Each structure stands twice: as C-alpha cells, then as structure tokens.
C-alpha cells in the first residue's frame, strides 16, 4: 500500500507502507489566533492527524508557535509565491510546508527554501491543481488533463531535486473525479514519492463526500495514496469524520466502529431512521474495533447482520438485541438504543 519513499512530518510518517493519515485545514482567518487554536483542538479531538494552516503574510507566521503549543499533531504551512514566508515558517517550527517551487521565483529562492527545510528535516508538499498549471503545460495539453497535472507536479519536484532535496509529497487535485484518479495513477507509475490524495473544490457536504469517496476510495483500493484530505464547504471536523469513514469502509482503518443499517421497507414498524442516527452519533468516538448493526425488522435483521458483533432489529413498537446473529433479549422501542449501548460496553 502506498509509496516506496517515506517522509516524516512531526510525529507522523507519510508513505513507505505506513498507515494512511487523515488531514484537514483550518478555515478560521489566520489573524484570529484564538479561533484557529480552538478549531485545531477540535480537529485533533475528531481524529485529524495533520493540520494545515494558510500563512498568507508575515503576521500569520505568529500562528505557528500558537498551534504547536496547543496540539500534538503536525502543522503544515500553506504558502504561495513568497519564499520568505516559507523561511520564516521553518524558523517558527513548522512541521511541513505546502508550496509550489515554480511559483516562488528564481533558483536561488528555491534553493533557500530547500536548504532551510533540509536543515530542519521539514518535508515539502508540492500541491498542484487545475488552477495552478504553468502556461507552457496548458499550451501543450490544451486544458488541465491528468497528464498536465502529473507533468506539473513532477516538474516542481525536479526543481527541488536539483538542490538535493527529496523529502517530497505530491498532490495533483482536480474537482473532476476521473481526472484526479488518472493523474494520481500516472504519478504512481512515474515516481516513488508519497501521494496526498484529494478532490479539490469537491463541494458541499453532500456532494463533496460522494466525490471524495469515489476518487480517494478508487485510488486507495488500488494501493495508491499515503495521506488523504476530504475537502468540503463545511465545518472541517466533518472532513475528518468523512476521511475516517472512507478508510473504515475500505477496511484500511480498523480502529473504531463499523456501522451498518438497513434502508428500511414496508415491514419496518419502528422509527429506524431516528434510532440509526442516534446510535451512529453516540458511537462516533468509540475506538472499539467492532461492527454494529441497526436493522428494521426481526424477520431478516439478525440473519442479514449475523457478521455484526452486536445489533438491534425492530419489531412492532419493540425490538430484539442480538449478538453475532443470536438473539439476546427483547426490549421496548424506547429502550433499544440504551440496550444496544450497554452491550457495546460489554464487548
């Protein structure tokens, strides 16, 4: 699974067969240090393993030590155009830089950033997307094709390689899922650098999760990808939940509850939608490696979910609690959730 090369950002290893890490990005203004710190803590608590922050100007560099003091996960500085901001971020203790070397000027500036990162063991992510492609590459391909995205990423990597810098992570994001998938497939064929997967500008929570699941999931199933970010026009905490859900759905991540529930049918006699949502919410932060099922009827429920460690199946104003397909007891509908949670505690 993943790349051959491994880089280290703070306490997280990326690539080289290590676990797939989950990332997100602060969306609080970088001048709001208190708000940024509060959101970073929320992301860490939700399971975010790498947090990125925009560093648009010199004042924003002050955010880095505040974040480093507040959370234990690595902090990534997102920098565009001004190489001096990258140097200042390095000096401030940043764990990783996101930058496109071709956008920061002459070779001496690229060398300065490469040297500063090498001296401190700071990896650099080259983040290419449809809007960042060079004029020459666009002229060659006509529009942001997968080949264009891959060529651009490898071009930027070559600028760092020229100065003996190889602690590189690549991303080639597109808002078109098929383009994104093909771009990463090409990169996986042409280099051994760790790959940061994501569908950029994926959209609101509903469509963004669908597009990210399709794109990120397809690549991970084929062993491509080392770290992921689900980009949503929503609370970043929801990005983290969605990313972990993708990893659980693919059986890549084993920590936490795998939750299954039936779509309901005419046999359902309980408010299964309400019950399922309540159970899922209450087990969101449970770290037990178990499968929990919420089924609509007692006719098929226990049998269909016999692989679940624990579950409930609805009846007429009541329901059954079952374990590995075997019925444990019958309880009233209003007690089903509590009964299920009690059994989860025993596991």
State the predicted function of each range.
Residues 84-125:
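Hydrophobic or amphipathic alpha-helical targeting/insertion segments
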Residues 33, 44-67, 98-106, 168-177:
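Glycine-rich, proline-tolerant flexible connector loops at the mouths of alpha/beta enzymes
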Residues 70-73, 91-97, 118-120, 188-194, ...:
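Glycine-enriched alpha-helix->loop->beta-strand junction motifs that scaffold or abut catalytic
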